[in-house]
């Protein structure tokens, strides 16, 4: 069953026309209105036919839970087939709807809109953090972990026990301030922390569905970075030469930074046996949905992280205390997660993504906490160098109450490090394999949050995978494991940079990408054919990615096109430049809308400036032909 729960000032409907499966109704049933109501839009699905009564009971529980949270006494039950593409039979749907109605009557003022009729309806959503919630209800046996599923069957996805636990986990939401005080997240005054307020609302509401496309979707296409691939599954993208360049630069940078702290790069398989006893247990402890396939009569799943391969490798290794902390990293191209279709959008949430996945084996919890702090700082530094500052993301720290009681000072230091309030999620019981976790979350232009960097302290998998090390006394011990993605998914880094630029544009600033990531760093524009030789000479002398706009277009159009491509430096060459040997350069980062910053400099000075801006960041050559006239159009 799919549920969409809207806390509304009012909801009213009026039937218009029956469909072939319409239930028979009395005249009084043809219209209805409730004030201050919780409206439950519902779609009964084919899975639900296996046990309609369990679906009724669980739906009633969900509705009552939300009604209690929002203090609603009026409930409208509204059949809404558009929530699912895999509906149950009309007979089962009506019986489930009536069953829910009967179970709620007596406790609430309940009204049910008729099934199988075209209806006009009007609703006014209250707009508070809990006013829009969605729920998916699945029968326990509908999608057993270990069953082969088809890639195109949304209903047959594999759902881990951890994901189910995540849906039902009781969370205590707090704001941790740098002075170490914990405050209730829903009552704490977040004035001056607008993005944190949006993040808090997003986390508490758990509404992950996308109502409109965020700005980066149009930008990724216009800048010819990436696009949807209609020939693949949803959430699988194509990357054009510019996008591939940007991805590879970030990938290389993250791997290089990880190498500096001693991480060894490895490579592991994309698919694993779902019935492998160790892996099957881990599947149920990781909150993700998996793609599954069949190979030689074996049930396989596509990895959603590098944990499986690295832990199996750790199991087979001989490890001494002298080797600890032991770090291994893999740039997973790709990791696969069967994210729900309504959550997929652009580069923000994908089903196939590139993720740097590092694991650290530590001798004990004390060492793990120390490493956690170091990697927290490393992640801040990595995002900053990519172009995402502390002011651009919000911090979430998640832990069990027991861990917090034992490590208050350490957790407070995490808030002090970023010098701003952070969101805390606390659990009474440990639902997952970790006791402590942080994420840096980017809040985009439509107030949706996405996790970037993350580190977790894992207290289960050393035992599960039988990973050991020999201590100084020759005794066999279990390590404590850290999971770390230093930057988060590479695609999300690009998403965050594009969204950040779009929000800058909304504030009246000129949008930019970091120079080291810009596919073209300098564009040379000759005014006429006679200036082409000097333009070529300038472009060839630059120690950066430089191209030449040699198209038969007006200079004005060439300059506008360079602006639409966000080229950091645009050098226009005419008669005076040829005579003086200097070029007139527009510097995008120092420009304002309709007020370009133009500076005259030599080609050598321009080259030195760009070279210094790139600094020690990775570099790759131009991904396309140097002459624009030689380039194809991808979009």
UniProtKB/Swiss-Prot annotation:
List of residues binding Zn(2+): 307, 359, 483
EC number assigned by the record: 6.1.1.3
Pfam families (UniProt xref): HGTP_anticodon, tRNA-synt_2b, tRNA-Thr_ED
Region (Catalytic): 215-514
Top-rank lineage group of the source organism: Archaea
Catalysis performed (reactions): tRNA(Thr) + L-threonine + ATP = L-threonyl-tRNA(Thr) + AMP + diphosphate + H(+)
GO terms for biological process, alphabetical: threonyl-tRNA aminoacylation
UniProt keyword list: Aminoacyl-tRNA synthetase, ATP-binding, Cytoplasm, Ligase, Metal-binding, Nucleotide-binding, Protein biosynthesis, RNA-binding, tRNA-binding, Zinc
Similarity comment: Belongs to the class-II aminoacyl-tRNA synthetase family.
Protein name: Threonine--tRNA ligase
Biological source species: Methanococcoides burtonii (strain DSM 6242 / NBRC 107633 / OCM 468 / ACE-M)
Name of the gene this protein is made from: thrS
């Amino acid at each position: 069953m799919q549920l969409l729960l809207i806390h509304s000032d009012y909801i009213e409907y009026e039937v218009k026309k029956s469909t072939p499966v319409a239930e028979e109704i009395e005249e009084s049933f043809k219209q209805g209105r409730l004030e201050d109501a919780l409206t439950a839009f519902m779609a009964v699905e084919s899975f639900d036919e296996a046990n309609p009564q369990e679906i009724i009971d669980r739906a009633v529980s969900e509705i009552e839970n939300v009604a209690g949270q929002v203090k609603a006494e009026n409930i409208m039950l509204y059949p809404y087939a558009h929530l699912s593409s895999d509906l149950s039979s009309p007979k089962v749907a009506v019986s489930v709807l009536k069953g829910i109605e009967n179970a709620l009557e007596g406790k609430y003022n309940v009204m049910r809109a008729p099934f199988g009729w075209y209806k006009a309806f009007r609703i006014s959503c209250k707009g508070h953090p809990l006013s829009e919630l969605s729920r998916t209800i699945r029968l326990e046996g509908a999608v057993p972990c270990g069953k082969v599923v088809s890639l195109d069957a949304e209903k047959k996805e594999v759902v881990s026990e951890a994901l189910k636990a995540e849906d039902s986990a009781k969370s205590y939401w707090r704001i941790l301030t740098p002075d170490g005080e914990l405050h209730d997240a829903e009552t704490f005054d977040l004035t001056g922390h607008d993005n944190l307020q949006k993040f808090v609302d997003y986390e508490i509401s758990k509404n992950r569905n996308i109502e409109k496309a965020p700005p980066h979707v149009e930008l990724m296409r216009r800048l010819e970075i990436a696009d949807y691939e209609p020939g693949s599954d949803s959430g699988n993208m194509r990357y054009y030469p510019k996008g591939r360049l940007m991805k590879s630069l970030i990938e290389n940078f993250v791997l290089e930074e990880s190498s500096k702290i001693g991480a060894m790069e490895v490579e592991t398989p994309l698919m694993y046996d779902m019935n492998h006893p160790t892996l099957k247990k881990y599947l149920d402890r990781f909150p993700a949905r998996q793609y599954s396939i069949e190979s030689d009569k074996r049930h396989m799943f596509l990895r959603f992280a590098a944990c499986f391969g690295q832990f199996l490798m750790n199991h087979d290794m001989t490890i001494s205390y002298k080797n600890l902390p032991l770090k291994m990293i893999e740039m997973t191209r790709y990791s696969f997660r069967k994210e729900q279709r309504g959550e997929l959008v652009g580069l923000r949430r994908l089903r196939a993504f590139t993720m740097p996945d590092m694991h650290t084996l530590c001798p004990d919890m004390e060492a793990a906490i120390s490493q956690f702090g170091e990697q927290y700082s490393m992640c801040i530094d990595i995002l900053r160098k990519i172009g995402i500052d502390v002011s651009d993301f919000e911090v979430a720290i998640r832990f069990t109450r027991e861990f917090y009681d034992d490590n208050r000072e350490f957790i407070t230091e995490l808030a002090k490090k970023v010098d701003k309030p952070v969101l805390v999620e606390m659990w009474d019981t440990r639902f997952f394999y970790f006791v402590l976790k942080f994420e840096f979350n980017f809040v985009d232009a439509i107030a949706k949050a996405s996790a970037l960097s993350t580190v977790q302290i894992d207290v289960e998998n050393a035992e599960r995978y039988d990973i050991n090390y020999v201590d100084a006394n020759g005794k066999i011990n279990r390590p404590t494991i850290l999971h770390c993605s230093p930057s988060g998914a590479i695609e999300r880094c690009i998403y965050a940079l594009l969204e950040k630029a779009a929000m800058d544009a909304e504030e009246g600033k000129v949008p930019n990408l970091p120079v080291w990531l810009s596919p073209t760093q300098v564009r040379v524009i000759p005014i006429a054919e006679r200036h082409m030789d000097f333009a070529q000479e300038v472009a060839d002398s630059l120690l950066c990615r430089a191209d030449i706009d040699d198209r038969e277009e007006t200079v004005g159009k060439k300059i506008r096109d360079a602006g639409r491509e966000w080229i950091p430096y645009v050098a226009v060459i005419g008669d005076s430049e040829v005579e003086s040997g200097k070029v007139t350069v527009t510097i995008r980062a120092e420009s304002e809308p309709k007020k370009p910053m133009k500076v005259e400099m030599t080609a050598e000075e321009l080259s030195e400036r760009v070279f210094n801006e790139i600094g020690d960041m990775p570099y790759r050559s131009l991904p396309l032909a140097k002459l624009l006239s030689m380039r194809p159009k991808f979009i």
